[in-house]
Amino acid sequence: MSQDNEYGAGQIQVLEGLEAVRKRPAMYIGSTDSRGLHHLVYEVVDNSIDEALAGHCDAIEVALHEDGSVSVTDNGRGIPVDTHEQYDRPALEVIMTVLHAGGKFDNKSYQVSGGLHGVGVSVVNALSSELEVEVKRDGAVWTHRFEVGEPQVEEFERVRDLEPGEDTGTTIRFWPDDGIFETTEFDFKTLENRLRELAFLNSGVEISLSDERTDESSTFLFEGGIREFVEYLNETKTALHDDVIYYDDESEGIEVEIAMQATDELQGSIHAFANNINTREGGTHLTGFKTALTRVVNDYANTHDMLDDLDGDNLRGEDVREGLTAVISIKHPDPQFEGQTKTKLGNSEVRGIVESVTHQQLGTFFEENPDTATAIISKAVEAARARKAAKQAEELTRRKSALESTSLPGKLADCQSRDPAESELFIVEGDSAGGSAKQGRDRKFQAILPLKGKILNVEKHRLDRILENDEIRALITAIGGGVGDEFDIEKARYQRLILMTDADVDGAHIRTLLLTLLYRHMRPLIEAGYVYAAQPPLYRVRYRGNTYDAMDEAERDRIIEEECNGNPTQVQRFKGLGEMNPDQLWDTTMNPENRVLKRITVEDAAAADRMFNILMGDAVGPRKQFIKDHANDAEWVDI
């Protein structure tokens, strides 16, 4: 797209070597599971996004190939190919083989750059069995090839001249090393969600994704940027005002962009980004926004006598944010990330800048749009009334201490251990299964809480109504960390919550209701990795005195073929946990030596918010459309 040559070998700064990457990949990409695998793609795409932020690229193509490789193509300036003085090698080779070698560390080339770990394509190269690069710049097409991170001798070559009018740019194609990654199969949906998010955050950049394996493809281009992001998140919700509120500003080299829209939902949905990185743990930009938002709303409400119903109280932040969908995006030349997963923005100066911008621009917006201000404040006042009503009920559910066993629910069969790190709570569907679980468990560290029937769908109710539900109250009390904004994970009595429901449609529904409760009102449990779904076997196969358990039909068929010579004595399908006796339940589902647990994680909070709203919210239309779109993907249906 651009012929600007300020980006050359001289701008490539080298910080350290690559030796340790293959030995300790998790240090560089977070993990070697599916999340780490997809992070390789994000690292390469981030380089293209940096070119876009610098104004040199407006199209990025990601392709999943049938041979298991991925290619990322952009129309930026192309990676420099001239000789690097320090190394006496092409800059392209240095970038691909030396950790932290790149123009990101030279502010002349990139004022702002993304990349959570910021490790660059050299790490992608180190963790790939093979990598190929094609660069179009300096009037020619250049190629290079690497194997296990090593440049191949005489593989760097000038292939041909650029055609007149042909775009500059870079294509990187890599094959992840299956000796390092637990899986090398890329998931289209995971990449699609992240690339859609990047397109929203970088208006005017077209990002496409294609999958040769399935012929699926998606293209994203959002001229409206984060305005359109908020509209997308609110597609399934009823907005309280027509237009998305949007403002942006720049101060001290830091760009601030904020979009928001209030809805009649009970759950808020605020997503904060720094240099395109989803800061799931929040940070100074989010704190600044929340502080200013609450102050602006209260200032306007008090000036216009709108808080008379609250007995002299002001609105709290949680009241103002109820049903609010917002996206905060900042671009910082030197972001500092902290927190457990390095997804919390730590730059102290950002808070004041975001606060000031929001106070000034949102305050002005309210004065110029009184109808919108009134709609937002009326909703917040309603939320404050409900909060006060919920306060009394909430007190009943809060545990005095994480280690006390007084006033626990009568139906809870608690464990002997008082150490949350070794304690686990099985949340079991039905009294009959609960009885088997209580008898089959290891009392030292396993607690059992049977739930009767289906709990309330919390997506449709405020906290005061939720806390009237006996089963939910028992669950909150048993967990011990409180609920809602005041939930304290340090007070949780168990560090493993295991949802154990039947392997049928009703069981799946109960599990979904429980996950909705945990996601909306005790989300830190999911974010900390404390929540699991038990995976009880679906089938038991007997043959000549031997017993085999199968998790699904494919495993059942394999056992019948390989272990039973195609002629089993008996095949039993477990319809419910209650059909298993205590010993069977222990052996198959509860014994840490044998069991299979599925950890519940949230990769993408915006996508999760939207999905919970579609599946569990009030609007029927989006749910109906979702079912139509995905009916063919259903693995089993009870009719």
UniProtKB/Swiss-Prot annotation:
Mg(2+) 1 binds at E429, D502. GO terms for cellular component: chromosome; cytoplasm. GO terms for molecular function: ATP binding; DNA binding; DNA topoisomerase type II (double strand cut, ATP-hydrolyzing) activity; metal ion binding. Residues 392-416 are annotated as: Disordered. There is a cross-link at K624 (Glycyl lysine isopeptide (Lys-Gly) (interchain with G-Cter in SAMP2)). Few gyrases are as efficient as E.coli at forming negative supercoils. Not all organisms have 2 type II topoisomerases; in organisms with a single type II topoisomerase this enzyme also has to decatenate newly replicated chromosomes. This is DNA gyrase subunit B. It comes from Haloferax volcanii (strain ATCC 29605 / DSM 3757 / JCM 8879 / NBRC 14742 / NCIMB 2012 / VKM B-1768 / DS2).
